[in-house]
C-alpha cells in the first residue's frame, strides 16, 4: 500500500467542489493509499531528519462532512512513499523553509511533488523568462522610469507584482492613465521591489486558459477563465467564470514546448496560464482547476498524476 502525505491549507475550510488537493486525495483513496494529512506547522527537522505530525484521513464527497481523521502520529517523512506539497502561496520565507524540510525528506527517500528545489527555483511569474519566444513582451525591474518607458513604447500594458496570486494587484495601464506613477510606486514599493510589465494581450476577453501538465504530458482539456464584464482579469478569485474546453493547436504547442523542462526539473504537476497565444505564468506551487475540467470531460487528471507517482515510487 502506498503511503501518501499531503501538505495543504486547513482541510476544514476548503471548497470540495473546486479544491484540486481534495480531488487528488479522493483518487489516492480510491486506489487504497493511506493518506497522511499535514499543514505547514506539522513539518519539523530533528538532527537533520525530516519529521512530521500527521493525521491519517478518510474523505467523502459530502459538503456537510468531507473528512475524518483516523489516527495521529509523529513519523519520519521518509516513511511516506510520496508527499504532495499543496500549500497555497504566499511564497514567503516560511514556505521556503518548508521546502528545505521537504528536501531533507527527499534525500531520505520520499518522492516530493513538486521537487522542493524547483519550487524555490521557479517563481511562477519569472520562470516564463526562460521561454521568451512564448510570452508577451515583458520586462522585470524596480525602476519607475523603465516601466514608464515600456508603457510609452507599448501603450496598453499590464503591471503586476512577482508574488501575487488569484489576480491580486494586477493593473492594466493604458495611454494617458493619470494613475500610472502611483501604480508603479505601489507595485515597486517606491523602487524597493521588482515588478513585471507586459504588453496587454487583447485576447483576454476569450479567457485566461489554465492548462495542466502532468509529468511532462499536457492534458487535452483546459479551463478558460472568462473575465467578468469590465474586468481585465480572468482569475476565478477575481470574479471570472470558468469554462472547460479542449486545447487549441496553439495551446498544445505552447504546452509541449514547456513540458520537457518541467519534467526535467521534477515539476510533476504544473498549471500553465495562456492568454491568446501567449504564455503568461507557470504555476508550480498548488495549481488548481482539476475539478472543473474533470466535471466537464471524461478525463481523470488525478488518475494521471497518481500513475506518475506510482511509476516513480516503483522506480519505473
UniProtKB/Swiss-Prot annotation:
Domain named ATP-grasp: residues? 124-310
Per UniProt, the enzyme's principal EC class comes to ligase
Q: Which residues cross the membrane?
A: none
EC number(s) stated in the UniProt entry for this protein: 6.3.2.3
Q: Which GO terms describe its cellular component?
A: cytoplasm
Highest taxon, organism lineage? Bacteria
Task: Point out the signal peptide segment.
Answer: none
Positions contributing to Mg(2+) binding: 281, 283
Q: Name one GO molecular function term.
A: glutathione synthase activity
What catalytic reaction does the record list? Answer: gamma-L-glutamyl-L-cysteine + glycine + ATP = glutathione + ADP + phosphate + H(+)
Cofactor(s) the protein needs: Mg(2+); Mn(2+)
- Pathway field: Sulfur metabolism; glutathione biosynthesis; glutathione from L-cysteine and L-glutamate: step 2/2
| Cofactor: how and how many bound | Binds 1 Mg(2+) or Mn(2+) ion per subunit.
Q: Which residues bind ATP?
A: 150-207
Matching entries from Gene3D superfamilies are given as: 3.40.50.20, ATP-grasp fold, A domain, ATP-grasp fold, B domain
Swiss-Prot/TrEMBL keywords: ATP-binding, Glutathione biosynthesis, Ligase, Magnesium, Manganese, Metal-binding, Nucleotide-binding
Query: What InterPro entries does this protein's entry cite?
Result: ATP-grasp, ATP_grasp_subdomain_1, Glut_synth_pro, GSHS_ATP-bd, GSHS_N, PreATP-grasp_dom_sf
* Family stated for the protein in its record: Belongs to the prokaryotic GSH synthase family.
Protein name per Swiss-Prot or TrEMBL: Glutathione synthetase
Organism ancestry: Bacteria, Pseudomonadati, Pseudomonadota, Gammaproteobacteria, Vibrionales
Gene expressing this chain:
gshB
